[in-house]
């Protein structure tokens, strides 16, 4: 027991000691922990304060960035700001009473620094922070009064300042409520034109439990104060280059507000404002005056659009569409006037630039067109003398057809009927060229052209005659004074060339007349007879395989060989009398007006033939220009000159020849068809040598056909195979009449209606052919003389008197009887 007692107190003592030790250790640790937490808290607080300062600084910077920059203003007041005392007294401009509870605000550098209200005496004392060089504006306003602003600026720092602001009382306006619009008008008794404000009824937003009848409108016009210059000056701000102060001189001012239940209603939208203007000399109708409104945040007048000056009831008014109700003034300023003038000037300049450009362009176009027309005219004038239009040529092509042994004269087919005066001298001025299928002649010298020209004139005399048909008791006689017109059958007297050989004296006189005429008119020596064709006999070569087709045989009749009946070239066939046994083509109507004085030149006998008798024919001249193996008159095939009858003549001539030569075996070389149908070997003809002493050379040719008997056949075989017959589709009725078949040294057969050979051919049908007498009947002579007497002087213009006498005295049939036909067997 004693041992147990000893152990308990020791354990208790050890426990107490441990507890005490533990108690000492815990507060020390706690105190250590508390000391460490306080430091961290302080640090955290400091960090939070720094962050708050940074955030505030950022906010201030953002707020300053949002404000407009003003020259001389700084974002932060770096320098120490001076403060001075400012006393503001507010009163009524009409009653001069002090206004209590009026709001007074101070703006320094377009920022609000102070805002307070007046006391009962209408005064208030304000501490204003100010720095030299900054703008300062004091604004006072009160319900029922128009806002008044006072811009102020000083060059020295004041200690104390006192100012008085007079407020304009608002005038109650007349308000008119319509279903869709609201009209507010003024109450000016002495004004000719009342101010008015009109806007849509939908723009009014009434509070709850408010009716439209509780709305009250106020419209105040300050022009009565402007008359006495009692309106305070205003300062405007433009944004031309940042913020710039502009001194304003208002011409009109209006304040419009709407109240409902004592509270102002805000109206935003398109509001039409019409305000009368003062009579000033510098305002005209159509001028644009800028509109200004007061900004309550910056304390300055701000430009907001343009108004237009108009005339109403003989008074000038300023009209403007405002974005909201409030306080508006119309005041021009130098800066805004410059803007307006510049804009107007730019508009006017642009308008006039377009207008002047259009005028200048039109003028340039007109000038260019004028010069172009002038250039074309001058070019045409200069080029006219150089033009050589070949309307009609002197036998352009002289072509020999070896197949038919005929001479084709290819002319330019189109001959103009109307010619210009300057082109007439060129009508007969052309070159002559001849070619054959085997060869073409090269260019000739000028001397050779003259020789060819003379030969052409001498060798190609074409006998033409105007023919009309007079039917008296079935007897047809030739009337040389009438011509058959192919168009309407109208008969017109024309000049007649009877191809009578003149005497030596008459020829010399006529030659002198024609030479003088050629010198006057500048005509060439191409005779008019080349344009008028007279049917004559022709020699045609026939090949066995050429006329095999029946339609070709029908259209290949001769145009010169006489036969009875009427010949119709086309689908139309009519019965005719057998007295119409010959065919003669009338003179071309298109050439009837081209009769020049040189048309009678072919009747003149050249030097070697002037001493020969007048009965001698001129067919011998064909032999001078034809080739060696052909000396056949080519008058028929020269009819290609006459475009309307060219193809008919060729086809008719060949068809007649084929009919006459039917049933006979083809000759190995060629056939010559005479008037009595005899072959070449049995036909002979006596001829008169017109050039007895001057002709030294002659070709060994047949007197009848003109074919060179010594010429080889090889050169002509191919040409025969190439021959074709050209036919026309238009029906042409050609009447047969006796022909002037003259003989010459070329060997052509001469026949007349009195010849027995012609009578033998024409007796194929029944009836009796009435023979023409050798001498002309007196009735015929009288008819000719009467017609020549009645011929108009216009048709006889240019005819020499000797030729007229010779034509009236000479008879063609008499000449034919003087040429005897002697058959040589």
From Swiss-Prot:
InterPro entries per UniProt: FAM171 (IPR018890), FAM171_C (IPR049175), FAM171_N (IPR048530)
Membrane topology: Single-pass type I membrane protein
Keywords (A to Z) from UniProt: Glycoprotein, Membrane, Phosphoprotein, Signal, Transmembrane, Transmembrane helix
Localization of this protein: Cytoplasmic granule; Membrane
Signal sequence, renumbered to the chain: 1-32
Entry comment describing in which tissues the protein is expressed: Expressed in the brain, predominantly in the thalamus, in the hippocampal formation (in CA1, CA2 and CA3 regions and in the dentate gyrus), in the cerebellum (in Purkinje and granule cell layers, as well as neurons of the deep cerebellar nuclei) and cerebral cortex (at protein level). Expressed predominantly in neurons.
Chief site of localization: cytoplasm
Glycosylated sites: 109, 114, 214
Positions of the UniProt region annotated as Disordered: 52-74, 693-717, 770-825
UniProt topological domain (Cytoplasmic) ranges: 375-825
Residues with PTM Phosphoserine: 792
Positions in the Extracellular compartment: 33-353
TM annotation in the entry: 354-374
Record bears the keyword Phosphoprotein: yes
Basic and acidic residues compositional bias, start-end: 57-68, 772-784, 804-825
GO cellular component: membrane; synapse
Family, as annotated: Belongs to the FAM171 family.
Protein name: Protein FAM171B
Organism in which the protein naturally occurs: Mus musculus (Mouse)
Gene designation: Fam171b
């Amino acid at each position: 027991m004693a041992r147990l007692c000893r152990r308990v107190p020791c354990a208790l003592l050890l426990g107490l000691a441990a507890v005490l030790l533990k108690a000492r250790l815990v507060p020390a640790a706690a105190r250590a922990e508390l000391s460490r937490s306080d430091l961290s808290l302080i640090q955290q607080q400091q960090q939070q304060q720094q962050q708050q300062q940074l955030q505030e600084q950022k906010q201030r910077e953002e707020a300053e960035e949002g404000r407009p920059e003003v020259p001389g203003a700084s974002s932060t007041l770096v320098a120490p700001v001076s403060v001075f005392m400012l006393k503001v007294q507010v009163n009524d401009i009409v009653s001069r009473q002090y206004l209590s509870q009026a709001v007074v605000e101070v703006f320094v550098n377009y920022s609000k620094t102070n805002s307070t209200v007046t006391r009962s005496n209408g005064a208030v004392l304000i501490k204003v922070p100010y720095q030299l060089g900054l703008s300062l504006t004091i604004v006072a306003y009160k319900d029922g009064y128009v806002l008044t602003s006072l811009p102020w600026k000083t060059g020295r720092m004041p200690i104390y300042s006192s100012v008085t602001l007079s407020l304009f009382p608002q005038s109650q306006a007349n308000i008119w409520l319509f279903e869709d619009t609201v009209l507010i008008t003024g109450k000016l008794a002495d004004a000719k034109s009342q101010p008015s404000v009109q806007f849509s009824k939908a723009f009014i937003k009434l509070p709850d439990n408010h009716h439209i009848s509780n709305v009250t409108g106020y419209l105040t016009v300050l022009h009565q104060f402007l008359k006495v210059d009692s309106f305070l000056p205003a300062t405007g701000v433009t944004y031309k280059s940042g913020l710039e102060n502009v001194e304003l001189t208002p011409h009109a001012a209006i304040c419009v507000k709407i109240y409902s239940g004592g509270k102002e209603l805000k109206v935003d939208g398109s509001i039409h404002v019409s305000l009368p203007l003062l009579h000033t000399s510098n305002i005209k109708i159509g001028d644009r005056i800028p509109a200004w409104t007061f900004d309550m945040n910056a304390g300055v007048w701000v430009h907001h659009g343009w108004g237009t000056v108009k005339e109403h009831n003989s008074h000038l008014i300023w009209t403007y569409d405002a974005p909201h109700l409030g306080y508006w003034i119309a005041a021009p300023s130098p800066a805004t006037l410059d803007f307006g003038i510049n804009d107007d000037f730019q508009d006017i300049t642009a308008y006039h630039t377009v207008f002047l450009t259009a005028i200048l362009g039109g003028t340039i176009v007109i000038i260019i067109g004028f010069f172009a027309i002038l250039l074309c005219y001058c070019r045409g004038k200069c080029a006219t003398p150089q033009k050589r239009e070949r309307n009609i040529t002197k036998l352009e092509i002289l072509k020999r057809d070896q197949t038919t042994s005929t001479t084709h004269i290819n002319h330019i087919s189109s001959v103009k009927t109307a010619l210009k005066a300057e082109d007439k001298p060129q009508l007969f001025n052309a070159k002559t060229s001849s070619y054959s299928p085997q060869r073409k002649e090269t260019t000739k010298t000028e001397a050779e052209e003259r020789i060819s020209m003379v030969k052409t004139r001498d060798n190609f005399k074409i006998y033409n005659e105007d023919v009309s048909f007079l039917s008296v008791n079935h007897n047809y006689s030739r009337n040389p004074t009438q011509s058959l017109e192919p168009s309407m059958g109208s008969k017109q007297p024309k000049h007649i060339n009877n191809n009578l050989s003149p005497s030596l004296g008459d020829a010399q006189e006529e030659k002198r007349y024609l030479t003088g005429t050629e010198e006057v008119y500048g005509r060439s020596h191409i005779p008019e007879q080349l344009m008028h064709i007279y049917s004559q006999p022709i020699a045609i070569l026939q090949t066995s395989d050429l006329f095999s087709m029946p339609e070709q045989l029908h259209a290949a009749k001769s145009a010169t060989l006489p036969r009875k009946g009427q010949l119709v070239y086309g689908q139309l066939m009519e019965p005719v009398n057998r007295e119409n046994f010959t065919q003669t083509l009338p003179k071309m109507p298109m050439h009837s007006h081209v009769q020049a004085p040189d048309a009678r030149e072919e009747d003149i006998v050249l030097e070697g033939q002037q001493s020969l008798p007048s009965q001698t024919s001129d067919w011998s001249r064909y032999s001078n220009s034809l080739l060696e193996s052909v000396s056949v008159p080519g008058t028929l095939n020269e009819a290609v000159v006459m475009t309307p009858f060219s193809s008919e003549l060729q086809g008719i001539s060949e068809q007649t020849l084929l009919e006459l030569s039917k049933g006979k075996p083809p000759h190995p070389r060629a056939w010559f068809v005479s008037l009595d149908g005899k072959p070449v070997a049995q036909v002979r003809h006596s001829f008169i040598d017109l050039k007895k002493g001057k002709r030294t050379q002659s070709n060994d040719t047949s007197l009848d056909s003109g074919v060179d008997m010594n010429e080889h056949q090889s050169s002509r075989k191919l040409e025969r195979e190439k021959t074709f017959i050209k036919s026309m589709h238009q029906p042409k009725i050609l009447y047969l009449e006796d022909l002037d078949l003259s003989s010459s040294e070329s060997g052509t057969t001469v026949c007349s209606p009195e010849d027995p050979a012609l009578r033998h051919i024409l007796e194929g049908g029944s009836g009796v052919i009435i023979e023409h007498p050798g001498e002309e009947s007196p009735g015929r002579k009288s008819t000719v003389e009467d017609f020549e007497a009645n011929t108009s002087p216009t048709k006889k213009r240019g005819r020499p008197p000797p030729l007229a006498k010779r034509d009236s005295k000479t008879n063609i049939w008499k000449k034919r009887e003087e040429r005897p036909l002697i058959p040589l067997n």
